A protein has these predicted regions:
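Membrane-proximal, glycine/serine-rich, low-complexity loop/turn segments characteristic
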Residues: 21-22, 35, 60-62, 84, ...
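Structural motif
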Residues: 27-39
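Short Pro-Gly-centered beta-turn/loop motif in secreted/extracellular proteins
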Residues: 36, 64-72
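A short, solvent-exposed loop/turn motif at the edges and junctions
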Residues: 48-50, 75-88
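Short, acidic Ser/Thr/Gly-rich low-complexity loop/linker segments typical of extracellular
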Residues: 50-62
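Outer-membrane beta-barrel translocator domains and adjoining extracellular loop/strand segments
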Residues: 208-210, 274-280, 344-361, 402-413, ...
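Surface-exposed extracellular loop regions of Gram-negative outer-membrane beta-barrel proteins
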Residues: 451-453, 504-505, 555, 587-630
C-alpha cells in the first residue's frame, strides 16, 4: 500500500512540472559584419549551462528553434569555425533574434610543412625519392630498388607490381627507349626529386581516351640538374690478387625543354658493367641471328659463389644519346653505344661418387676467357599529335664474340674448347596511325635482317675424339599490317589484317674423327591473318573487356639439302580465340583475367637433321617432323 502511495505522489510531481513548462519558438538570421548570411552556424539554447535545443543555419543564414523551459530567461549561444563565438541572455517569450558575428582573428603558429612520401593523382603515382633513398644509394638504380611496388631486376629491367614497364621517360621525354640502364646507372639519385609511375599509359596522344594496361616510368629532376650542363665523374683505385684495380667513369648530361643529351664513358677492371649498359629491354633478342641460337655460348658450370667474387673482368663502355624536339609534336632521337667486355676466371670442380666399396672422384679444372665487342645504333623519328601518330625506328646491333675454355680432367686429360662468331642485325619499324570521325586507322611495316657470317666451336681432347662445329645463317623478315577500328560510345571493334614473309638460310657442319655431316636448310614462310576483336570500356573506366579471334593461314616451304636430305611443303589454317578482362577495384588495386587458345606449328629447327654439337658431351638434332602444339592458358592477376 505504501509503495503505491509513493508512486502516485511521484507521478503527480512530474505532471505538475510538465504543466509548469511552456513551449517557445525562436527564429532569426545570423550574418557577418557586412550583412552577409552565415551558413552552418551552430545555434543553441542553454538552461543551467546545458543545451536544451540546437540547430544549424541554412544557406540564407536563418534558423528556427523550438524548446520547453520553466524559466523566464535562457542563454542563446551562436558559434562558427570562422567567427567569434557569441552568447547572450534572452527572454523566453522572445520569438525573433538576429545575430551578427565578428570574424575570428587567429594567430597561426609556425609550422614545418613536409611533402608526403607518395602522392596519387589519377593514374599517376609519385614517389618522393629522398624519402626512400639510403645514404649508400648513389645512383638512381640503387634508390629505385627501395621504392615499394617497383622491382629492379639484376639485368636492370624495371617492373611495377610484377609488370614490365612499356616506356621510360626523363621529364616526359623518351631519350633512351629500351636502353634506360644508361640513365639508371649514371644519373645520381640526388638529381631526381620524384619517380612517377604512369598507370593506364598511352604513348600516343591520340589514344588518350583509350583504356590501357601499360605502365610507364617518368623521372622528375631537381632544378640544379635541368637547363644547364651537369656531370658526374668518379675514379677508384686499389690492389687485388692479380695486381692493380681501377675504375673510371664519367657522365655528362643536359636536360632542356626542347633537347636532352646524355653521354657516358666507363673503363675498369673491378666489376662487369659493359653488357649491362648496352641492354635494350624492349628489343630483347629480336636482332639475334639463328646461328647464335644454334651454337649458344661456350661456358662452364658456375661456382656456388657470387660471380663477382671469382672473376677478373676488364670492361669498357661508351654511349651518346640525343633527343631533339623539331616542333611541339615532332622529335628525333639518336642512341649510339659501344661495349667491350673481357672476363677471365679459374675454377676447380670435384664430384665424388661412391658405391659402398670404392670411391670415384671426377676432378675438373676450368680456366675460362671471354671477350665481347658490341656496338649498337638506334635512330627514331616521331610525330605524336592528337590526330596522328607516326614513328620510324631504325635499329642495328653487332656482336663479336671469342670464348676459350681449357679444361683439365682428373689432373691428366686436357680439353681445349673455343668458340668464335660474328653476329649482325638490322631492323626498321614504321608505324602510321590516324583517326577520322568514328574510325581509327593504322599501318605498320617491319623489315629486319640478321646474319651470322661464320661461327665456330672447336674442341680437342687428348686421347679422345675431337670435333669442329661451324655454322652460318641469314634471315629476312617482312611484316605488313593494316587495321581499322570502329568506335561507338564505349565500344570498339578492331579489324586488323596482317601479312608476314620470312626467308631463312642456315648452314652447319660437324667434323669429328669418325663423322662428317652438314645441314643446308632453306625455308620460306608466308602468313596471312585476320584478327577481329571487340572491346568494351566502362564510361568511368571501372573495367575493360576484350574478346577476339585470330584466323590465320600459313604456307611453309622447307628443304634440307645436307647429309640427310628432306623437303616439306604445307598449308595450315588455325583459329586462336582469346579474351581479356580488367577490373579496377581501387585506383591502386587491379584484377586482370585473361585466357587464350593457341595452335602453333613448328619452324626451321624441325628440319635440322644432321647433328649439332656444342660441347664435348652434348649433341642434338631433329627428326625432320614438323611439330604442332596446342595450348590453353588462363591467368588471373591481382595487384
Amino acid at each position: 500500500m505504501m509503495k503505491r502511495l509513493l508512486l502516485y505522489i511521484l507521478c503527480l510531481f512530474v505532471w505538475i512540472q510538465a504543466q509548469a513548462q511552456e513551449n517557445y519558438t525562436l527564429t532569426g538570421i545570423v550574418s557577418d559584419s557586412n550583412g552577409m548570411p552565415i551558413r552552418n552556424a551552430n545555434v543553441q539554447i542553454l538552461e543551467n549551462n546545458k543545451p536544451i535545443a540546437y540547430t544549424f543555419t541554412n544557406e540564407k543564414g536563418s534558423y528556427a528553434l523550438s524548446y520547453n523551459s520553466v524559466k523566464t530567461q535562457v542563454l542563446l549561444s551562436i558559434g562558427h569555425i570562422s567567427f567569434e563565438k557569441t552568447k547572450l541572455v534572452i527572454d523566453s517569450k522572445e520569438t525573433k533574434k538576429n545575430i551578427t558575428l565578428l570574424e575570428k582573428k587567429t594567430q597561426l603558429r609556425e609550422v614545418v610543412v613536409k611533402a608526403p612520401q607518395i602522392i596519387q593523382r589519377g593514374d599517376t603515382l609519385s614517389y618522393r625519392l629522398s624519402s626512400f633513398a639510403g645514404k649508400d644509394d648513389y645512383t638512381l638504380r640503387d634508390a629505385m630498388k627501395r621504392l615499394p611496388g617497383i622491382e629492379v631486376t639484376n639485368s636492370g629491367s624495371i617492373k611495377y607490381l610484377g609488370k614490365d614497364i612499356s616506356n621510360f621517360y626523363i621529364e616526359g621525354m623518351d631519350l633512351l627507349g629500351g636502353q634506360y640502364n644508361v640513365a639508371t646507372n649514371n644519373i645520381p639519385a640526388d638529381y631526381v626529386t620524384s619517380v612517377q609511375v604512369l598507370n593506364n599509359h598511352k604513348d600516343a596522344k591520340m589514344d588518350k581516351d583509350v583504356l590501357s594496361d601499360d605502365v610507364a616510368i617518368n623521372i622528375k629532376l631537381s632544378k640544379h640538374a635541368k637547363f644547364k650542363p651537369v656531370g658526374t665523374y668518379e675514379a677508384i683505385g686499389g690492389l687485388g690478387s692479380n695486381g692493380g684495380l681501377y675504375q673510371t667513369n664519367g657522365a655528362g648530361m643536359l636536360f632542356k625543354s626542347r633537347m636532352q643529351l646524355l653521354g657516358t664513358f666507363k673503363i675498369g677492371n673491378i666489376r662487369e658493367f659493359a653488357t649491362d649498359e648496352n641492354i635494350n629491354h624492349f628489343l630483347n633478342d629480336q636482332l639475334e641471328s639463328y646461328g647464335v641460337k644454334l651454337l649458344g655460348n661456350l661456358s662452364s658450370s658456375n661456382a656456388p659463389l657470387k660471380r663477382e667474387r671469382y672473376i677478373h673482368p676488364k670492361d669498357y663502355s661508351a654511349s651518346f644519346n640525343l633527343l631533339y624536339k623539331l616542333s611541339e609534336n615532332k622529335s628525333l632521337r639518336t642512341n649510339v653505344g659501344y661495349a667491350y667486355s673481357q672476363c677471365n676466371y679459374a675454377y676447380n670442380h670435384k664430384m665424388f661418387f661412391g658405391n659402398g666399396l670404392d670411391e670415384l672422384v671426377q676432378d675438373y679444372q676450368y680456366q675460362s676467357a671471354f671477350t665481347l665487342h658490341k656496338p649498337t645504333l638506334t635512330i627514331e623519328y616521331k610525330d605524336n599529335s592528337d590526330k596522328r601518330y607516326i614513328t620510324n625506328r631504325f635499329s642495328s646491333v653487332a656482336s663479336f664474340v671469342k670464348s676459350e675454355l681449357p679444361t683439365v680432367e682428373n689432373n691428366s686429360n686436357s680439353v681445349f674448347q673455343n668458340e668464335k662468331y660474328h653476329d649482325l642485325g638490322f631492323s626498321n619499324n614504321l608505324s602510321i596511325r590516324w583517326k577520322t570521325n568514328k574510325f581509327r586507322w593504322s599501318l605498320s611495316s617491319l623489315l629486319s635482317y640478321t646474319t651470322m657470317p661464320n661461327g665456330t666451336i672447336r674442341v680437342s681432347h687428348v686421347g679422345v675424339a675431337s670435333f669442329q662445329q661451324s655454322a652460318n645463317s641469314k634471315q629476312f623478315t617482312n611484316q605488313e599490317t593494316i587495321s581499322a577500328t570502329y568506335e561507338r560510345r564505349a565500344s570498339r571493334v578492331y579489324f586488323p589484317l596482317s601479312f608476314q614473309y620470312r626467308s631463312e638460310r642456315v648452314y652447319s657442319a660437324l667434323i669429328t674423327d669418325d663423322y662428317s655431316g652438314f645441314n643446308l636448310v632453306r625455308g620460306n614462310e608466308l602468313d596471312f591473318s585476320f584478327s577481329p576483336q571487340y572491346e568494351y570500356t566502362h564510361p568511368q573506366r571501372k573495367y575493360n573487356f576484350k574478346a577476339g579471334v585470330s584466323l590465320a593461314t600459313t604456307r611453309i616451304d622447307f628443304e634440307n639439302e645436307g647429309t640427310t636430305p628432306l623437303k616439306k611443303q604445307k598449308w595450315s589454317f588455325v583459329i586462336n580465340p582469346s579474351f581479356y578482362f580488367l577490373y579496377n577495384v581501387t585506383p591502386r588495386v587491379t584484377i586482370r583475367i585473361q585466357g587464350a587458345f593457341a595452335n602453333k606449328i613448328g619452324d626451321l629447327a624441325d628440319f635440322i637433321t644432321a647433328p649439332i654439337q656444342t660441347s664435348l658431351n652434348y649433341q642434338r638434332y631433329s627428326l625432320g617432323i614438323l611439330s604442332e602444339n596446342r595450348s590453353v592458358t588462363l591467368n588471373a592477376i591481382y595487384d
